[in-house]
């Protein structure tokens, strides 16, 4: 039994910058200014005291979902942290502190990202990023989910997930797909080298969920760095399947971040199909694949890294 509000778009200007994150070899990301901090939020609440609203039409204990929306928007102005997950914990704890009839809260959000735009420098010699004008990004975005309940009246985190979603990558060569089952149902030809196009969502959980909040930035895992690990491993590895590729990405993520307990993948194969291979050199013409498309899901933890 639960209810809530979703698609709550909230934007905060000049939020606290994210600074002091640990850098890694695969990424140049070392922080974000948070001049624009945007989220698409979903909140779900639980509590036995809400049962009469379902069984008897008695709304005495019901917090209207419109009020939940307003609560989220108001708290965006009160939040003094720098991370998506930190804001979710701040809002979730606020709900539990404010409404005793709520026994558990789950708050999740997709980050709304903004791209920096170049403008001429004042002296006309080159370009610099504008600190006023941004472009709404169509690229991948961060994700977070925080679940909370009470322990002796104090809100505590019971579950946490962070992620980067909507990552789309194309590798023009250096990927294969061979050695799979050949039977009367097989029509797909083996490919020793192919242009591989995948869409990818990556999720991770910390050993200590408090690390997800970003209060100690050196233990925070930015989604931008995980994104960069994915494309660097894709560039480095000659994979024989998408399964092979995401496993190698997972190993690298766990290697770089010992504070993580697990990493999970949801991948979709969007590989283009060859139309012409008779062009000079390595050139070819390809087309979009028809529906249906293949997908892969995989979870791994530190035990997988220890076995290497």
Swiss-Prot record:
> Could you say which residues bind urate here?
65-66, 177, 194, 242-243, 269
Q: What class of enzyme is it?
A: oxidoreductase
Q: Name one Pfam family in it.
A: Uricase
Catalytic activity annotation: urate + O2 + H2O = 5-hydroxyisourate + H2O2
What UniProt keywords are attached to this protein's entry? Oxidoreductase, Plasmid, Purine metabolism
Among NCBIfam families, the record links this protein to: urate_oxi
User: Could you tell me the EC number(s) of this protein?
Assistant: 1.7.3.3
Q: Which GO terms describe its biological process?
A: purine nucleobase catabolic process; urate catabolic process
| Family named by the database record | Belongs to the uricase family.
The active site lies at 5 (charge relay system), 65 (charge relay system)
Protein name (Swiss-Prot/TrEMBL):
Uricase
Q: Where is this region: Disordered?
A: 283-308
Q: Does the keyword Oxidoreductase apply?
A: yes
In its UniProt record, a GO molecular function of this protein is: urate oxidase activity
């Amino acid at each position: 039994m639960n209810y809530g509000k979703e698609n709550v778009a909230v934007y905060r200007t000049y939020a606290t910058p994210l600074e002091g994150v640990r850098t890694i070899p695969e990424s140049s990301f070392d922080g974000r200014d948070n001049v624009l901090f945007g989220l698409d939020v979903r909140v779900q609440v639980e509590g036995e005291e809400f049962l009469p609203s379902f069984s008897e039409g008695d709304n005495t204990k019901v917090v209207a979902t419109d009020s939940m929306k307003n609560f989220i928007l108001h708290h965006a102005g009160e939040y003094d942290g720098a991370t998506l997950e930190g804001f979710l914990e701040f809002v979730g704890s606020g709900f539990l502190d404010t409404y005793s009839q709520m026994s558990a809260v789950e708050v999740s959000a997709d980050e709304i990202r903004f791209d920096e735009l170049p403008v001429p420098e004042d002296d006309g010699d080159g370009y610099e990023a504008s600190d006023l004008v941004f472009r709404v990004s169509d690229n991948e975005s961060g994700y977070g989910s925080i679940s909370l309940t009470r322990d002796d009246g104090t809100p505590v985190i019971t579950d946490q997930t962070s992620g980067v979603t909507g990552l789309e990558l194309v590798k023009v060569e250096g990927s294969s797909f061979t050695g799979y089952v050949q039977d009367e149902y097989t029509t797909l030809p083996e490919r020793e080298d192919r242009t591989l196009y995948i869409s990818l969502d990556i999720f991770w959980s910390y050993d200590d969920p408090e690390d997800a909040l970003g209060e100690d930035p050196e233990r925070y895992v930015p989604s931008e760095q995980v994104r960069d690990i994915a494309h660097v491993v894709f560039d480095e590895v000659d994979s024989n399947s998408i399964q092979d590729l995401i496993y190698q990405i997972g190993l690298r993520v766990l290697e770089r971040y010992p504070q993580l307990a697990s990493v999970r993948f949801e991948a979709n194969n969007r590989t283009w199909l060859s139309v012409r291979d008779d062009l000079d050199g390595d050139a070819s013409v390809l087309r979009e694949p028809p529906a249906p498309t293949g997908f892969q899901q995989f979870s791994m933890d530190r035990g997988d890294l220890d076995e290497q």
